[in-house]
């Protein structure tokens, strides 16, 4: 398959594309510092709730530093429950999923909800779609010179809203991407790897509560000694040890197996 602009996943422009991971031991539970007190004096006007934009097509300007304003158009896939200000977005022409606080980020300007809605499509092979979720795969990309570039990764889930697309991540570049993988499979560009001989996870008793890291803070020490902080925003249902992480200094969504890396 060809990617937009002839780029394979790892050719995105961003810092720290391949750091090793985040240790589960670095997790810190988020604490609340709110104080409860009685309000005295004039009350503040109640702000009107914002429109739910999940599933909507949007466009907005983007300005970083002293650079020019660029225009972006895409689809809002999800609003993150543990941080309702944060939205997951699939921008037109880009394969990775972005996480932005659309109403708070000062780099975002002139946010507009477009009238066109995302068309619903029927999955061509529901059984195959269910079969590939949680599986290791080899994904072939066509480079600019026509050669094939193989990327090994894992299919994480069906993407929300855009229901013929799938969330996937790669060993070489552990961030969240989405592709129409059924088409790639039928074209011979996606191969599902045989299941490993790893022992299956222990079955849980009915009603048993399993600790989740969702909502917890993470801290990652970079090679230069500096630290980056973020939050665990999602647990992958098909692989419960795998989580999505949104770092404060990056708009990409990172994908880590926090049991394996601990």
Curated annotation (Swiss-Prot):
Q: Which residues form the signal peptide?
A: none
Q: Which UniProt keywords apply?
A: Cell cycle, Nucleus
Q: Which Pfam families match?
A: Spin-Ssty
The record's listing under InterPro entries reads: SPIN/Ssty, SPIN/Ssty_sf
Q: Where in the cell is it found?
A: Nucleus
GO:BP terms for this protein?
A: gamete generation
Region Disordered, residue ranges: 1-50
Gene Ontology CC annotations of this record: nucleus
Please indicate if the UniProt record lists Transferase as a keyword. Answer: no
Q: In which tissues is it expressed?
A: Expressed in several tissues including testis.
Q: Its principal location?
A: nucleus
In this chain, composition skew of type Basic residues spans 27-38
Could you confirm whether the keyword Nucleus appears in this record? yes
What protein family is recorded? Belongs to the SPIN/STSY family.
Query: Its biological function?
Result: May play a role in mitosis.
Q: What is this protein called?
A: Spindlin-Z
Organism of origin: Gallus gallus (Chicken)
